[in-house]
Amino acid sequence: MYRTVRTLLAAVLALVPAWAAAQGAYPAKPVKVIVSTVPGPLDAYARIICEKIALSLKQPFVIENKAGAAGNVAAEYVKGQPADGYTLLFAIDTTFTVNPPLYKKLPFDPVKDFVAISVPVTYGQMLTVHPSVPAKTVKELVELAKTKPLNYASGGNGSPSHLVAAYFYSTAGVPMTHIPYKGTGQSVIDVIGGRVETLFAVTSGVIQHVKGDKLRALAVSSIKRSDLAASVPTIAESGYPGFDVSFAYALMAPAGTPDDIVQLLSREVQKAMAQPDVVEKNRAADYAATGMDPKQSAAWLVSSRERWAKVIKDNNISVD
């Protein structure tokens, strides 16, 4: 009997290394990373980070673009994939923070269908005006808006530039006419051309126009000043203490993905973020590295979603 027990125990112990190796084998094949936009800033950043992770884990991380519906197309696709760590989503955080309260019919649940791996970077927006606008500070712009009608451009209804503007102007208590465009590019062109008076836009996208005196920068929306424009104050420093609006990139996985895989990928993102060329990329693009782990990343998405839900409701913003 004891011999039988010893034989069985030996057989079980012999299997343990093989089982452990199988459990630690991730990734054992290429990982597909779905990017929710066409090639552009998000795509470029996803490629940089995924290249670093691929080198570290010794498996390809293959980028595939699935653009459409402000990230909803990509999210719906990834939601339907096996929760095994081999299909991930790299998206702008608004897919999970803005789209749920903005779209009446959403093809995914941001909480039930996904798990956060990392929110690696955040970035603010810069409040700019056409040089003809007689306001050189946020306070002067607010006072001016109280005495005469002013307007602001955005990249479209529900876009980040629309949301941060609606949030700020409602906070300041001044009426502003919203002029939406189909994309940020044309909105910037029309503010430079003097056809629209003000605009919030990603700092890295307008800083060259500020330096060329085609736009005047009044403030940035993030809690910290931008390294690209250190002399430009924050909105919080300009009379609105606590005002802090940043958007972010998010690496997500289908709900049910094993936690050890989620934690591994999170650590790999942080390793990538610490590499000198990524640090320089962050500086040049005005990205602030967060150091967020999966739990902190999930909390970021929840708090941002709650804020934007209120802004969307209070300002009657809709895309349907």
Task: Place the predicted regions along the sequence by residue.
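Bacterial N-terminal signal peptides that target proteins for export
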Residues: 1-9
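N-terminal signal peptide c-region/cleavage motif recognized by signal peptidases
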Residues: 15-22
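N-terminal (or domain-start) structured segment
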Residues: 22-112, 148-151, 157, 161, ...
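An extracytoplasmic/periplasmic, membrane-proximal ligand-sensing/linker region
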Residues: 28-30, 170, 259-320
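Short coil/turn segments
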Residues: 38-40, 93-94, 122, 130-135, ...
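Hinge/capping helix and adjacent helix->loop/strand transition within the periplasmic-binding protein
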Residues: 53, 80-86, 101-186, 235, ...
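A ligand-binding cleft/hinge motif common to bilobed small-molecule-binding domains
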Residues: 95-105, 167-171, 198-232
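C-terminal lobe and pocket-closing loops
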Residues: 122, 206-274, 303-306
